[in-house]
Amino acid sequence: MAKKILYQDNARRALERGMEIMVEAVSVTLGPKGRNVVLEKTYGSPQIVNDGVTIAKEISLEDHIENTGVSLIRQAAAKTNDVAGDGTTTATVLAYAMVKEGLKNVAAGANPISIKLGMEKATQYLVMQINEFAQPVEDIQSIKQVASISAGNDDVIGALIADALAKVGKEGVISLEEGKGIVTELEITEGMKLEKGFISPYFITDTEKMEVCFENPYILLTDKRITLVQQDLLPILEQITKTKRPLLIIAEDVEKEALATLILNKLRGIVNVVAIRAPGFGELRKLMLQDIAVLTGGTVITQDAGLSLDNIQVNLLGQARRIIVNKDTTTIVGDGLEIENIKARCEQLRKQVNIAETSYEKEKLQDRIAKLSGGIAVIRVGAVTETEMKDKKLRLEDAINATRAAVEEGIVPGGGATLAHLSENLVTWSKTNLKEDELIGALIISRAIVAPLKRIAENAGINGPVVIGKVQEQEFEIGYNAAKNLFGNMYDEGVVDPAKVTRSGLQNATSIASMILTTECIIVDDIEKVK
């Protein structure tokens, strides 16, 4: 296919045009007075969303070069979502502001490589400052504030997530389910999270979230490798097909031929199945499989117990209310029938902790007790319509991720205030430590990082530059509360952001922006020639 090639300023400007279209669509959602975006769906009703990364995924432009700009800035949003789970809109707004400021300087003759170095040094300084100013999250009230802000100023969701974390602990699992009514409820149930994901992506059932989600599945537990299709797999698959229920296989490994058989059955719709490798190694693996068996009411198929896969019956399989498997983890939500067995197993493990000889043994036993007894918080999302349900689930996911991030690295003043204050610190630091084009790079960052506050104010119908000026005159804790249209102490107002979200958004925005500023040439398919 013929190619279209653009150089230097033309190339960078074309990328900027694509970025501008994307950022405008995403940034309307920023802040407490941000608006919604309606997404047309090929199947089903349109989706109304307020989530940056979801909107970013939907945007695809006709112009190939502009679309490249969209793809690049989408990476900043996606990476921030992977690391912190929230702050995607902020990352997008920051990246575009950096590119816009940077292009002016590159066009005026500044060296892009030196600018890139200056931007990276400035970002390192800002990350240190964010970590320094971050306040640890210890009380339920702080957790509630973070969750409420991330869910779009929804105090009910904030209280629900704070309650869930209080019950299952910081490491506990919070799972979302679609409720039957219109009220969103919280339920604590037994369950376990394993640090193992699916063996093959062909098992995925939800392509949007890239995960496998099964309701009411059977669970096959074995410590052996599944290699032979006829002996190991077919007997149990035939029995499962009759029940019309899905199957989770947890085994040491699944060999190529057996894996191909499972995938083929899944793709043909004969049986819904997913396979994961058993967690742990050696003797620990067998013990962890026993723990899962207690949770699910199943039996581990091992040669030690005289059991083999070729004569297995359905009554030896475990059961769960729900399982969620992604590329890294597997969450098993219990059905509530094994509470007494779980308590007995935990008691047995606690006795072993007391007689364990090494600290390693004790640590592993305590880890197993935590996994078994920690439980899972299930939030049943209630809504009037399907469209509202999807929006609520996205907000809840953001809120859960933001809350975890806050517990990890602490909180800073929200509403764009932290970056607006640090902008002035950065100017002082860079003038002392950098020179020439590197200084220009740092000053680009200092001007760009006020963009989120400016956009939050504009979405609230207030003059952005005026708000920035007023905030920068005040102490570090003081910011602009767009929901109430007043200036005040952001910690007291409950407008806080997780430091991890602010940090990762800034780092990813700088990474993408500096790559675009050092671009000298773009090569894309020339669609017009083909026509």
From Swiss-Prot:
Broad class of the protein's primary localization: plastid
Record EC number: 5.6.1.7
Location in the cell: Plastid, Chloroplast
Signal peptide: none
GO biological process: protein folding; protein refolding
Catalytic reaction(s) noted: ATP + H2O + a folded polypeptide = ADP + phosphate + an unfolded polypeptide
Residue positions binding ATP: 29-32, 86-90, 415, 481-483, 497
GO molecular function, one term: isomerase activity
Keywords, comma-separated and alphabetical: ATP-binding, Chaperone, Chloroplast, Isomerase, Nucleotide-binding, Plastid
GO cellular component: chloroplast
Keyword Nucleotide-binding: yes
NCBIfam families: GroEL, PRK00013.1, PRK12849.1, PRK12850.1, PRK12851.1
Protein family: Belongs to the chaperonin (HSP60) family.
Subunit annotation: Forms a cylinder of 14 subunits composed of two heptameric rings stacked back-to-back. Interacts with the co-chaperonin GroES.
PANTHER family: 60 KDA HEAT SHOCK PROTEIN, MITOCHONDRIAL
Function summary: Together with its co-chaperonin GroES, plays an essential role in assisting protein folding. The GroEL-GroES system forms a nano-cage that allows encapsulation of the non-native substrate proteins and provides a physical environment optimized to promote and accelerate protein folding.
Protein name (Swiss-Prot/TrEMBL): Chaperonin GroEL, chloroplastic
Organism: Thalassiosira pseudonana
